[in-house]
């Protein structure tokens, strides 16, 4: 089976969030048994092309977007995946000067790339074309209007239903879409506005989200009734599939960043397992200047953004100070107000013996925290899937979550973690923290059972890939 994914980020090349990681994991698992290709734009300021001798092909092609255009497709293989990067030769201003993936002109830029990608797919042929989020939503309409050879199915995965790609009809008219297919993207209430996600929903053969609960949640999203109508119309061709994590990348067995490696098998003698985590905790506390070495350690490894529940993060700080346990927060702030608030907290708590706030992201430090911490807190307002809780469980770190989206699908309260539900109830959140910390301190048998359940949780990529293959073959 030949599968082509189209997206605007892919973790080995460039990424801004979970989409890039999820696509990489899925493509890697599929590539084990199927011809798998990922098509993304080339961002010259953000990624350097492999040397020419490492490329497997360089193709020139034409596409139509705001007139006849030309592009170059550079292809190479990475871990069995064919990666194709598009340089828009006659529209270089769209990507060549971009210093971030996302800019203020995304709809036009991503539609131009989608037009080039669709032209390439029509030329190359594929059995499955798999789109990721609204960014490449135009590809669905273009391939429905002019299918490629051997095309069996167009699949759309919604990594974040909150972003939809609102744009103008004028931009859709710049493509080769005819009036019928433009109407699939158009808002009835405002014919001059088109929504790339809306058209992709109608033009795809199957729609997936990244967790079963998130699939149910988006059917109850009434923030735009026309988008609600579109997703409701596809509900019989909608399925939630949990992302997996790459256990060869994430795991304490061989992670070179840890003070002490450890395995799930060590848990046959729990004291040896917890001794290994304690050695990682001691090493981390020395790095961060923390002193409550024998207290429970809770971590938050997250972007600090409204989606991630920053109001709960502040409550966690207060709770840790009141209850004498360690709290470590690491992540980049999004938004000036949040940055100012957390920078002030960081400064005021700089000498705290049990709280550290690090307003940056370090992959090495994140891994050390996963291994050292006893618990990881993820109080998200919404979470389509979430990989952090799965990574935490791989390291034997118990997740404390809000029961939404993929967090609800992966964490069972009192079984392999702790959860709360109300997105605005500080009392419920603090009760969850208290229960988790008290269990750690006073009920060692129950804590061992919870950690064991975390280690037994299956989050491998192959499970997710097989579920996608079922959809491809339907």
From Swiss-Prot:
Name the family the entry cites: Belongs to the glycosyltransferase 1 family. Bacterial/plant glycogen synthase subfamily.
Q: Which NCBIfam families does the record cross-reference, listed alphabetically? A: glgA, PRK00654.2-3
The source's domain of life comes to Bacteria
Q: Any idea which UniProt keywords this protein has?
A: Glycogen biosynthesis, Glycosyltransferase, Transferase
**Gene encoding this chain?**
glgA
EC top class named in words? transferase
Pfam families hit by this protein: Glyco_transf_5 (PF08323), Glycos_transf_1 (PF00534)
Q: Which reaction does it catalyse?
A: [(1->4)-alpha-D-glucosyl](n) + ADP-alpha-D-glucose = [(1->4)-alpha-D-glucosyl](n+1) + ADP + H(+)
Q: What Enzyme Commission number(s) does the record list for this chain? A: 2.4.1.21
Question: What does the record list as GO biological process?
Answer: glycogen biosynthetic process
Give the pathway listed in the UniProt entry for this protein. Glycan biosynthesis; glycogen biosynthesis
Q: Give the protein's recorded name.
A: Glycogen synthase
**Which residues are listed for ADP-alpha-D-glucose binding in this entry?**
15
Question: Which HAMAP family does the entry link to?
Answer: Glycogen_synth
């Amino acid at each position: 089976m030949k599968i082509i994914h189209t997206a605007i980020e892919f973790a080995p090349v460039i990424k801004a969030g979970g989409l890039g990681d999820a696509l990489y994991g899925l493509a890697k698992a599929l590539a084990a048994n199927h011809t798998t290709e990922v098509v993304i734009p080339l961002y010259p300021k953000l990624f350097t092309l492999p040397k020419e001798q490492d490329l497997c092909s360089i193709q020139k092609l034409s596409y139509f977007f705001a007139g006849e255009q030309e592009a170059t497709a550079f292809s190479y293989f990475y871990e069995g995946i064919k990666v194709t990067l598009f340089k828009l030769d006659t529209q270089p201003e769209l990507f060549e000067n971009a210093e971030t993936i996302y800019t203020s002109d995304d709809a036009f830029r991503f539609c131009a790339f989608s037009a080039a990608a669709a032209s390439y797919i029509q030329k190359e042929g594929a059995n499955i074309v798999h789109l990721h989020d609204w960014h490449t939503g135009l590809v669905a309409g273009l391939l429905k209007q002019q299918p490629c050879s051997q095309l069996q199915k167009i699949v759309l995965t919604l990594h974040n239903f909150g972003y939809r790609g609102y744009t103008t009809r004028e931009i859709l008219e710049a493509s080769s879409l005819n009036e019928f297919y433009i109407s699939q993207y158009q808002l009835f209430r405002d014919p001059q506005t088109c929504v790339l996600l809306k058209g992709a929903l109608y033009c795809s053969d199957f729609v997936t989200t990244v967790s079963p609960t998130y699939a149910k949640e988006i059917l109850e999203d009434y923030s735009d009734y026309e988008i609600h109508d579109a997703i409701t119309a596809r509900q019989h061709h909608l399925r939630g599939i949990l992302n997996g994590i790459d256990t060869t990348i994430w795991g304490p067995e061989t992670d070179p960043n840890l003070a002490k490696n450890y395995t799930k098998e060590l848990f046959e003698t729990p004291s040896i397992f917890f001794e290994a985590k304690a050695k990682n905790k001691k090493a981390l506390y020395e790095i961060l200047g923390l002193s409550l070495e024998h207290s429970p350690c809770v971590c938050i490894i997250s972007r600090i953004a409204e989606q991630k529940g920053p109001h709960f993060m502040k409550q966690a700080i207060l709770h840790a100070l009141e209850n004498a346990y360690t709290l470590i927060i690491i992540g980049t702030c999004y938004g000036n107000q949040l940055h100012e608030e957390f920078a002030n907290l960081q400064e005021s708590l700089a000498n705290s013996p049990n709280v550290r706030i690090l307003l940056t992201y370090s992959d090495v430090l994140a891994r050390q925290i996963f291994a050292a911490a006893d618990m990881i807190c993820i109080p998200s307002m919404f979470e389509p899937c979430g990989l952090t809780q799965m990574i935490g469980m791989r390291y034997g770190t118990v997740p404390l979550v809000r029961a939404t989206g993929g967090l609800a699908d992966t964490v069972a309260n009192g079984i392999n973690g702790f959860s709360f539900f109300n997105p605005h109830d500080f009392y419920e959140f603090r009760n969850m923290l208290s229960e988790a910390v008290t269990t750690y301190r006073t009920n060692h048998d129950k804590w061992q059972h919870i950690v064991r359940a975390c280690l037994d949780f299956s989050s491998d990529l192959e499970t997710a890939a097989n579920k996608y293959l079922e959809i491809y073959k339907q």
